[in-house]
Regions:
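Acidic/His-rich, divalent-metal-binding segments that scaffold phosphate/diphosphate chemistry
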Residues: 1-116, 120, 124, 135-138, ...
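Conserved small/polar residues in nucleotide/adenosyl-binding loops
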Residues: 184-193
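Active-site-proximal, acidic helix/loop segment immediately C-terminal to a metal-coordinating Asp/Glu
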Residues: 153-178
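Long, mid-chain structured domain cores
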Residues: 101-102, 119, 170, 174-177, ...
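Catalytic, metal-anchored helix/loop core of enzyme active sites in primary metabolism
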Residues: 129
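Conserved beta-strand-loop-short alpha-helix elements that form
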Residues: 144-156
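Amphipathic alpha-helical "output/dimerization" segments
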Residues: 57, 140-147, 171
Length: 194
C-alpha cells in the first residue's frame, strides 16, 4: 500500500524564512527576522479585508518569503564586490532583480490560490513610482498588503522613537495614496495614544 506524503506548507515556508534570515545574517550581518514580522503585519491587515482560509495561508506564505531572492541577489553581488558596496547597491534600481528572482522561485511552491505577481510587485508604490511603475489598480492586493507591511516594518525598525516612527508611517501612508490598504494598516496597528 502506497502512503500519501503530507507536507505542512506553512511550517515549510517558516523554515525557509528562518533559513533566509540565517543566510542574510551571515552574508550582510542583518539579524532581524523581517519576513516573520512582515507576515504578521500582513495577516493583521488581512483581517480587515476578510481574507481567510486558503487565501490567508497563501498571503502568509508570500509575506514570509517576500524577500526570498534577496539573499540570492546579495550572494551574486558579493562574488563581485565587498559587503559594504553590496549594502549600498541595494537601491531601488536593483530592487526589481530580487522581485524577478523571487517571483520565479515561488512558482515552484504549491499555493492553493493565484499568487501571480505578488512577489514581483511587492515593492510597487500606489502612485506608480516603484521599480516596475505599476499603479495601485495594476498591483495584486496581496502585493499591496505585503509592500505596506514591508515599509512599516522597515520604518519601525530603523527609527528609535515610537512617536517619530508612528508620525513617519502616517506621513508615508498619506503620501502612498493606496487609501484602502493604508486605512486597514492604520486600523490594524492603532494604539490608544494615536
Amino acid at each position: 500500500m502506497k502512503e500519501e506524503l503530507s507536507i505542512d506548507i506553512i511550517g515549510l515556508a517558516g523554515a525557509c524564512s528562518y533559513a533566509l534570515d540565517c543566510i542574510e545574517a551571515e552574508l550582510v550581518n542583518i539579524k532581524n527576522k523581517h519576513g516573520k514580522r512582515v507576515a504578521y503585519i500582513s495577516i493583521c491587515m488581512a483581517e480587515y479585508w476578510k481574507i481567510q482560509g486558503d487565501e490567508l495561508q497563501d498571503l502568509a506564505m508570500c509575506a514570509l518569503l517576500h524577500d526570498n531572492a534577496l539573499t540570492q541577489y546579495i550572494s551574486e553581488e558579493l562574488k563581485k564586490d565587498s559587503v559594504i558596496h553590496c549594502k549600498k547597491d541595494l537601491s531601488e534600481k536593483k530592487t526589481n532583480l530580487h522581485c524577478i528572482y523571487g517571483e520565479k522561485n515561488i512558482t515552484k511552491l504549491p499555493f492553493k490560490t493565484d499568487v501571480s505577481n505578488v512577489i514581483l510587485y511587492h515593492h510597487e508604490h500606489a502612485d506608480g513610482t516603484g521599480p516596475f511603475q505599476k499603479k495601485w489598480n495594476e498591483i495584486p492586493l496581496f502585493a499591496r498588503i505585503i509592500h505596506l507591511a514591508d515599509i512599516i516594518d522597515i520604518i519601525r525598525n530603523s527609527i528609535d522613537s515610537d512617536d517619530n516612527s508612528w508620525d513617519f508611517m502616517c506621513q508615508y501612508l498619506s503620501q502612498n495614496k493606496d487609501s484602502p490598504v493604508s486605512y486597514t494598516h492604520l486600523r490594524a496597528h492603532e494604539t490608544p495614544e494615536h
